[in-house]
């Protein structure tokens, strides 16, 4: 079945959806884009051309689009603070929802959205694109196949040069916690996935160097404990001097009982322990190289396909809104840890919001 889609957000990263992710799924008949919304007329026109839409299929007001467009689901690619209003419009029209991360800009709103969707009986997925990129998927398959034994630690480094104003999208430069909400939301999610268990405790420190043109903190160090005994260390910066590990070129290392797997700049290598040796030493670049998994679609293009398979009565996608609350909880419990200056118990933090969720 080909599903009809109303897409919300053509500017910024929304343009990537319009010129790459959506067209890949239009080309193979997975979806048909039947409407487009953006408050910026210029971005709207660029998106319209990418998608081959008619002028009457494009709108600057979301409410009007939801009234006039007949679609099976909507895709949301706008700032997190605006997500809930679009979710409400979609649910009122009986549309399923596929949204960019995070679910919302607060823990309370994220849980509220998940509850609204659950009560509606409709489906909502969240596009954790980096977990489903080709390199991270290969690393996940490697670790999941027990190539390095039981996981002990997961380390991740993101270092991007977005220090100048508007280099990372204007709204991020105006946020209080841009690194955690817009950056670490992906990386902590990947780390929990590789650890193979929910995060139980998180301790975070954030700051902003004087050369970073942001209102909020651009740098973060995060320590994580997982339910299976694994541990995690995260280092993130959007104000690094040279873009050493920019988007899609992160450094990730998984230490296991019998080996080490390293992902660096989209290249993966594995080091194995030789049990007959008393001790051994290794060096990055000298390990066993691992080829990336083959595939036609990755990142959000793949997640759109998975969402449609879910609508076709397949199993819920891994990043369905209810499961994705775990990823959101990582971010907002980290923010709470920054506020308190001490570790936060993640599952208790999440449960406190679930209990207190208020749906009118």
UniProtKB/Swiss-Prot annotation:
The record's listing under InterPro entries reads: Gfo/Idh/MocA-like_OxRdtase_C, Gfo/Idh/MocA-like_OxRdtase_N, Gfo/Idh/MocA_Oxidoreductases, NAD(P)-bd_dom_sf
Keyword Protein biosynthesis appears in the UniProt entry: no
Annotated GO molecular function terms are: nucleotide binding; oxidoreductase activity
Q: Which UniProt keywords apply?
A: NAD, Oxidoreductase, Plasmid
Q: Give all cystine bridges in this chain.
A: none
List the Pfam families: GFO_IDH_MocA, GFO_IDH_MocA_C
Say yes or no: keyword Ligase present: no
Q: Which domain of life is it from?
A: Bacteria
Q: Which residues bind NAD(+)?
A: 4-22
Q: Which SUPFAM superfamilies match?
A: Glyceraldehyde-3-phosphate dehydrogenase-like, C-terminal domain (SSF55347), NAD(P)-binding Rossmann-fold domains (SSF51735)
Alphabetical list of PANTHER family matching this protein? BILIVERDIN REDUCTASE A
Q: What does this protein do?
A: Could be a NAD-dependent oxidoreductase.
Task: Write down what this protein is called.
Answer: Uncharacterized protein y4oX
């Amino acid at each position: 079945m080909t599903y009809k889609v109303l897409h919300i957000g053509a500017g910024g990263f929304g343009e990537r959806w319009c010129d790459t992710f959506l067209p890949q799924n239009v080309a193979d008949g997975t979806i048909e884009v039947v409407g487009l919304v953006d408050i910026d007329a210029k971005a709207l026109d660029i998106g319209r051309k990418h998608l081959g839409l008619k002028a009457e299929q494009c709108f600057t007001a979301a409410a009007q689009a939801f009234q006039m467009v007949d679609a099976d689901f909507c895709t949301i690619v706008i700032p997190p603070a605006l997500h809930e209003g679009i979710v409400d419009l979609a649910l009122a029209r009986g549309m399923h929802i596929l949204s960019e991360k995070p679910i919302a800009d607060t823990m309370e709103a994220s849980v509220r959205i998940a509850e609204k969707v659950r009560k509606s009986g409709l489906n909502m997925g969240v596009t954790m694109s980096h977990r489903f990129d080709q390199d991270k998927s290969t690393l996940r398959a490697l670790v999941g196949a027990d190539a390095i034994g039981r996981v002990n630690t997961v380390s991740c480094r993101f270092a991007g040069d977005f220090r100048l104003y508007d280099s990372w999208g204007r709204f991020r430069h105006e946020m209080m916690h841009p690194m955690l909400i817009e950056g670490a939301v992906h990386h902590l999610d990947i780390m929990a996935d590789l650890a193979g268990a929910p995060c139980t405790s998180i301790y975070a420190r954030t700051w902003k160097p004087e050369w970073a043109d942001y209102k909020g903190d651009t740098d973060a160090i995060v320590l994580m404990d997982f339910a299976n005994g694994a541990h995690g260390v995260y280092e993130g910066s959007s104000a690094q001097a040279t873009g050493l590990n920019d988007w899609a070129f992160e450094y990730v290392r998984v230490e296991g009982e019998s080996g080490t797997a390293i992902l660096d700049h989209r290249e993966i290598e594995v080091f194995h322990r030789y049990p007959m040796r008393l001790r051994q030493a290794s060096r990055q670049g000298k390990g066993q190289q691992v080829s990336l998994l083959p595939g036609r679609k990755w990142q959000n293009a793949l997640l759109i396909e998975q969402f449609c398979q879910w609508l076709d009565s397949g199993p819920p996608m891994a990043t369905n809104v209810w499961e994705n609350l775990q990823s959101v909880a990582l971010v907002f419990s980290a923010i709470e840890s920054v506020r308190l200056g001490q570790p936060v118990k993640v599952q208790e933090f999440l449960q406190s919001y679930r209990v207190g969720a208020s749906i009118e």
